[in-house]
A protein has these predicted regions:
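SAM cofactor-binding core of SAM-dependent methyltransferases
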Residues: 20-90
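Short, polar loop motifs at secondary-structure junctions
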Residues: 33-37, 144, 219-223
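Short loop/helix-cap segments at secondary-structure boundaries that form the rim of catalytic
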Residues: 39-44, 168-171, 223-231
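SAM-dependent nucleic-acid methyltransferase catalytic core
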Residues: 1-14, 21, 65-177, 181-189, ...
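A residue-level signal for conserved active-site and pocket-lining positions in enzyme catalytic cores
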Residues: 34, 61, 104, 215, ...
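Structural beta-sheet core signal
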Residues: 50, 178, 215-217
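Long, positively charged, glycine-interspersed low-complexity recognition regions
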Residues: 194-267
Length: 267
């Protein structure tokens, strides 16, 4: 599947590698959903639940599930235009589909768009590329929206604090993929509408070390995580940031991961 949401911290480039390390489970929970890179690249589970505190994220995926044709038609009729992009920051609509459309315009047409509400410049192609990739992606977006709509119809969509769901869904038959906003001292700026303080991260870590569910959590290398998760398996995966810089991500797992072709650099 193709991504329908350009989102800070997205895992689309490394999704296959993450999915290859997911163990067998009956219930799948992703409490910090974002663009949903892992869920949209893995096989369906018997029970699947996604969650995000960001109203725009939840509204978007609910609209894709329930009104995909209407949303796709709206996107298809909108040009890739600086004027269109700029206008989204002064227009506020209560209609869910209009809100989803505006969110997509901001995410796809803004350079390094941040969901924190900060307006960035309009993104365009000039020279040095064989074609206008940003424009091409925008005009393929309607078909990508239609492509994930059916997948979303079998998924429970939550909208509450992640820790509440982690506690509620905790069981040996569950698997959690956690991709929280990374510690602010490991990155250059705030990117999300709902950031996490160091105390928030400590509460998360103190919760998951006592869970019976199988858990995978992503982050940057940091003493706080290494101290709490020192008994967990780890993977180190290079990934490209929103700004184009390659940084090494750490994936901690409270289970023994199976070696794959990725571990040997073959894929």
């Amino acid at each position: 599947m193709n991504t329908v949401l350009r989102y800070p911290g997205s895992k689309w480039r490394i999704a296959d590698q993450l999915v290859s390390n997911i163990p067998e489970h009956k219930s799948y929970l992703e409490p910090y959903f974002g663009s949903g890179a892992v869920l949209f690249n893995k096989p369906p589970s018997p029970i699947e639940t996604i969650n995000d505190l960001d109203d725009d994220v939840i509204n978007l995926f609910q609209c894709i599930r329930d009104h995909s044709q209407q949303l796709a038609a709206m996107i298809a009729a909108i040009p890739y235009s600086r004027k269109v992009y700029d206008s989204q920051f002064s227009i506020v609509s209560k209609d869910p589909v209009d809100k989803a459309c505006a969110f997509l315009i901001k995410c796809w047409q803004g350079y390094g768009f941040k969901t924190s509400g900060i307006k960035t410049g309009w993104k365009r192609d000039k020279t040095g590329r064989e074609r206008a990739y940003n424009l091409s992606n925008w005009y393929h977006l309607p078909e990508w929206i239609e492509g994930i709509a059916e997948r979303l119809r079998n998924i429970q969509i939550e909208h509450k604090p992640a820790l509440d769901l982690i506690r509620e869904f905790d069981s040996p038959d569950s698997f959690f993929y956690l991709d929280p906003p990374y510690l602010l001292n490991t990155r250059s700026a705030k990117q999300y509408q709902h950031e996490m303080t160091e105390e928030d991260h400590i509460q998360l870590l103190e919760t998951i070390v006592h869970c019976s569910a199988q858990i995978m959590i992503s982050g940057y290398d940091t003493p706080l995580y290494n101290d709490y998760l020192h008994t967990w398996d780890t993977l180190r995966i290079p990934n490209q940031t929103t700004s184009g810089v390659v940084r090494e991500e750490i994936v901690w797992m409270n289970y023994t991961h199976q070696l794959s072709l990725y571990d040997f650099g073959i894929l």
